[in-house]
């Protein structure tokens, strides 16, 4: 099966994100996947009215743009399967393979955050689209494209949540239709990133108690990583430190025990 990996990022991007992109390119070569990188042409197929309504909410525009590009590539027979990975996804275990058994799959994350108004942490499981893969003739792909546009037409432009057309929609649908999930492609919250960059603690312990298999790639969640520190330079340093730690886990990451090397 011919597989193509699709990514996109702004021309001006931080060095830590460039490391993520490089990890995906290297992994794609190891897995013998084709690789395509898009710049501003990512939004080529997105209707003008949709972009206008998104305004500055680029993640919402990207949620539709990636699907339209994947649909186009599949129509052109560029591949039998097209995989999208967000620019802030780090692949640190080279043996990761993404091959949907059904016609599509999405990622799954265990998101650790502080309890509101309480001490300690809580963890929530969510479907995410930092990874998405579709095969030829997938009926879900055109359905999602249609649903997202219908939702946008009805939405109040002043109240469009960043995850409205991505994780929130997919998690809601998953509860009904049970998507195939790639749990090996997870996500790390700011609380997890902080402990990866410094010392494992309660957040990592809670995360580890919930995971069902080793994480082989992680969405570093650029939109929330700014919570790591007040200064951009400190945020960048923490992300580089976390990336260094994850890259040392070539067999996968399941928690603090993965960080103890013989």
Predicted feature residues:
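N-terminal anchoring/stem segment of glycosyltransferases
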Residues: 1-62, 77, 135-139, 155-158, ...
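Alpha-helical context
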Residues: 4, 46-50, 67, 120, ...
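Glycogenin-like
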Residues: 8-9, 91-195
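Residue-level signal for well-ordered alpha-helical scaffold segments within enzymatic catalytic domains
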Residues: 26, 30, 68-72, 76, ...
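GT-A fold catalytic core of metal-dependent nucleotide-sugar glycosyltransferases
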Residues: 58-113
């Amino acid at each position: 099966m011919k597989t193509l990996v699709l990514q996109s990022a702004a021309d001006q991007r931080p060095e830590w994100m460039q490391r993520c992109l490089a990890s995906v390119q290297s992994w794609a070569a190891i897995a013998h996947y084709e690789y395509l990188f898009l710049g501003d042409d990512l939004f080529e197929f997105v209707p003008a009215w949709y972009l206008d309504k998104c305004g500055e909410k680029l993640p919402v525009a990207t949620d539709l743009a990636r699907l339209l590009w994947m649909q186009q590539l599949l129509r052109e027979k560029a591949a039998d399967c097209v995989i999208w990975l967000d620019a802030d996804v780090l692949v640190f275990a080279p043996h990761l393979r993404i091959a949907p058994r059904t016609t599509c799959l999405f990622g799954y994350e265990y998101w650790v955050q502080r309890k509101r108004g309480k001490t300690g942490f809580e963890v929530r499981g969510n479907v995410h689209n930092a990874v998405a893969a579709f095969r030829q003739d997938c009926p879900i792909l055109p359905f999602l494209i249609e649903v997202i546009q219908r939702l946008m037409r009805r939405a109040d432009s002043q109240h469009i949540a960043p995850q409205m057309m991505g994780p929130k929609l997919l998690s809601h649908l998953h509860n009904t239709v049970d998507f195939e999930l790639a749990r090996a492609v997870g996500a790390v919250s700011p609380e997890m990133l902080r402990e990866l960059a410094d010392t494992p603690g309660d957040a990592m312990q809670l995360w580890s108690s919930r995971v069902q298999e080793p994480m082989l790639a992680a969405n570093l969640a650029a939109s929330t990583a700014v919570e790591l520190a007040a200064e951009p330079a400190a945020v960048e340093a923490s992300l580089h430190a976390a990336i260094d730690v994850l890259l040392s886990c070539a067999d996968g990451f399941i928690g603090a025990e993965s960080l103890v090397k013989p």
